[in-house]
């Protein structure tokens, strides 16, 4: 069991149960999955770009991503149907907690001019999204070996019913929120 998973079971559950008045332990919100998505529009012109994106996402997540393809052709963007356009990976369980630990403790503090993450990126149902502009904030990516700076979207899905519950959960995991 990872460090954050033990911390969640021992401390966070009791704190959230007391704060929100849950009667049952199963009512306490938890993180169900983390989805990492990297859209690579340059893959239309050069097919090798998608391979670099897949290798970067594999290093970051520790799991092989799925290559996402276009659903329909759009002539204005010069895209045909079933063109590889990005990659995504869904983390659950042990790998999810290990990634969350690395994100909070190592990656986010390495962002240039970092003042905390926005508290307004919740979707209304207790899920949180973070946009990362450069993949080099993760220590697994070596700056000398990348071909281009690419951003990625990190979606944290929780069982929380409201944004306040989700924010309390993520704050307990020491997410550095701005105000």
From Swiss-Prot:
Q: What's an example GO cellular component term for this entry? A: ribosome
Keywords on record: Ribonucleoprotein, Ribosomal protein, RNA-binding, rRNA-binding, tRNA-binding
Q: What InterPro entries would the database entry show?
A: Ribosomal_uL5, Ribosomal_uL5_bac-type, Ribosomal_uL5_C, Ribosomal_uL5_CS, Ribosomal_uL5_dom_sf, Ribosomal_uL5_N
Q: Which organism is it from?
A: Bordetella pertussis (strain Tohama I / ATCC BAA-589 / NCTC 13251)
Q: Which family does it belong to?
A: Belongs to the universal ribosomal protein uL5 family.
Q: Which branch of life, at top level? A: Bacteria
> Per its database record, what is this protein's job?
This is one of the proteins that bind and probably mediate the attachment of the 5S RNA into the large ribosomal subunit, where it forms part of the central protuberance. In the 70S ribosome it contacts protein S13 of the 30S subunit (bridge B1b), connecting the 2 subunits; this bridge is implicated in subunit movement. Contacts the P site tRNA; the 5S rRNA and some of its associated proteins might help stabilize positioning of ribosome-bound tRNAs.
User: Subunit details for this protein?
Assistant: Part of the 50S ribosomal subunit; part of the 5S rRNA/L5/L18/L25 subcomplex. Contacts the 5S rRNA and the P site tRNA. Forms a bridge to the 30S subunit in the 70S ribosome.
Query: From the Swiss-Prot or TrEMBL record, what is one GO molecular function term?
Result: rRNA binding
Q: Give an example GO biological process.
A: translation
Quote the protein name from its UniProt record.
Answer: Large ribosomal subunit protein uL5
